Amino acid sequence: MMKKILRITALCIVLVSLLTFCGKSKIETKEDRPVFLEQVSTTAVAQLYADGFEQLSLNEKILAYYLAQAVIAGERIDYDQSHRHALEIKDILEEIVTHKEGIDPEIYQSILDYTKLFWIDHCQYNSRTKIKFVPTCPFDEFLLAAHAAQKNGAEFDLKENETLEQKLKKLEKTIFDPKFEPLVTAKTPPPGQDILTASANNFYAPNVTLKDLEGFKEKYSLNSRVSKENGKVKELVWRTGNQDFPAGLYHTELSEVIANLRLALPYASEQQKATLKHMIDYFETGDPDSFRKANISWLKDDSTVDFIIGFIENYKDSRGMKGEWEGVISYVNQKTTQMMKDLAANAQYFENKAPWKDEYKKTHTQIPVANSIDVVNAGGHAGPRIPAGINLPNEQEIRENYGSKSVLLHNVMRDARGVTGGKTSQEFLETAEEKKLAQKYGSLTVNVIIAMHEVIGHGSGKVSPKLTEDPSFYLQEYYNTLEEARADLMALWNLFDPKLIELQILPDEDAARTGYILEAMGDLTMLRRIKTGDRIEDDHMRAGHLIQAYLEKKILAVETFRKGGKAYRRVKDFNLFREGVGELLAEIMRIKAEGDLEAAKKLVNTYAIKIDPALRNEVIERCQKIHYPDFIAFVVPELSLVKDESGKISDVKISYPLDLMDQQLKWAGKK
C-alpha cells in the first residue's frame, strides 16, 4: 500500500534464521500437524497455520477471503517486475512439471526443484542475495524434457513458425548461464556499468542508463516502468485506466485486483471502505495523491482484519524508487498482542531517550497502532518468504504527520521455529554460558528486538525542515541500508533499558545480553547465504553487517576468533557494545535527517559491503553439516467460500495444502 511500506527488518532476517533447522524429517507441533514440508536446495519449505481464523466473525472471514484473492490476482505482476523474461520462463517450467510422463526422473527432479525456487523468488534470482541461480541439469537435458512435455500436451505459446528449440535457445543464457545478468539488483556495479545496466530487474528498459535519468523527474516514481524510445525517456504507468486515464502496464491483472477489492467492500469497516476506495482509484489512475490518501486512511484503522496490498517495497530497484507488487492479509492475535501495545504506548519515552540530537526527535501526537498478527495470505515480494515484522508507511512526511502502524507476524515466527531449533547456538557459540543464555532467552529476545525495530525503530525520528523531499531522494541507493540499520540500532540501544523489565517485556538483563550475543553471531551465520563473491547486495544483510563491522572494527566491542579450528564471534564488552550502538545510531539519524549523501556513502562502503570469502566458505560448510537452511518459505493457508442452498455465503473454510507445488499451480490456474 505505501511507498517503502513493508520493512523486512535486517534483524528479522538475521535473528529468525538463528533458530536452527532440525533436519529433514517432518517436525510436528500443535496437534501433531506437519510444519516442515521439504527442503529445496538450501531453502526449507514450511506450512503456515492461522489458528483462530475460525473464531473471526463471518464478515471478517469474507473480507479476508476477497482481500486474499486480490493479492493472488497480482502475482504475475511481481514476476514481470523481477525480469523481462520471468513470466515466459515461469510458464515454460509449469508446462514441463505438469506434463512429466517420459521425462528422466533425475532430470525432472532437477527441473522441479528449480521451478520451486522460481516460485519462491518470483524469478531466477534469490530475492534476498540478489544472485542468480540456475538448474542443476544441463540445457540439453532440459530441452529433451521440454520436448517430452510437448508430446504430452504441454503448450509453450510458440510464435508463428517458431520451434520449441528456438524458443528455449533464446532463453538459454537467461536460465543457465550464471555469469549472464548475474544480479537482479546491483548496487555496486562492475566497471563500465551503472546500477541500472548491471541490474537484471524489469523496472527499467535494458537501454536505460543512470545518465539518462539525470534531470528526468518521474511523476509516478513508485508505480511505473521507465523506458527509452528514440532517445526519449518516458514512464509506463502501472494502472488499469478509466475514462480519464489511458490503460497502462498490468491493466489486466490490476482489473482483477480491483474486482476483488470491490467484492470486499461490503464486508469492510467504514474506515476500511474509505481506504479501499482510495486504493481502487490508485490502481485505476496511478495517481500518487490517491496512494497518499489510502496511506493516511489506512493509518486511522485498527480493525481485527488488516491488509497490505499494492506496489510496496523498493529493495529490488537499485535506485530504491520502484515498488514491487505484494500483499499481506492478517488478523490480530489477541493473545499475544499486549507487548506491541505496551511498546507503542511508550513510544515517546523511547524517543526521548534516543541518542541523537533533540532537533531530530519526534513528538508522538498519538499512540501508534501496533499489533501481533496472524497471516492468512502473503504474496508477491512478501511471500512465500514472509517477513517477521512490518512497520509502515516509511514515507517520512506521512510518518511524521500521521504516525505509523507496526505488526509482529506471530504465526510466521512460531512456524519458523517449527523448522528451527538450537543447533546454531551449539555450533556457533563458543561458551557454555552463551549457549545456555541462547536456549533460555533466544526466542523471547528475538521477538522483542523485532517488535522494537518496528514500533520504536522505523517509527522514530524526524528530519530537518530544509529537506524538501523524502530522505530517500537525497540518500539514493544508500537509504534502505541505513534505514534498516537505524531501526536495528534503535532496538539494540533500548534492549537494556529498565523500562522493558518494568513492562514485563523482558525478565532481566540476561535476556538483553542474549540479544547482543545473538546479534554478533547472526552476522557470522548470515555469510552462508552469499555463495559467491565478496560483496553483499541486499539492504537488510548490509544493514546487519554494517552494525557488526562497525562494532568490531571501530568500537572493538566484538571480536572474531578461532578455537579448535573453528571461527566464533563474541561480545568482548557489553557496555562498550551499547556505547558503539548509540554512536552509530546517532550518526545514521543525522545522515538521514540532513540528507548527507557523502557521509552515507562512506559509512556503507566502509562497513556494510565487503565480506571475507574464506570465512564465508567455512560458515557454509558448517551450516551444511547441521542441515541449516539459508531461508524459510511458507505455504500459506487456503480460504474457500461456503454457500448455502440459496447461494448466500454461510462460511469461509480454511485449509492447509501442505504442498508448495499444489498451491502455486492453483494460483497459476493450472490445477
Question: Where are these predicted regions, by residue range?
Answer:
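N-terminal-proximal low-complexity accessory segments that begin disordered
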Residues: T29-I92
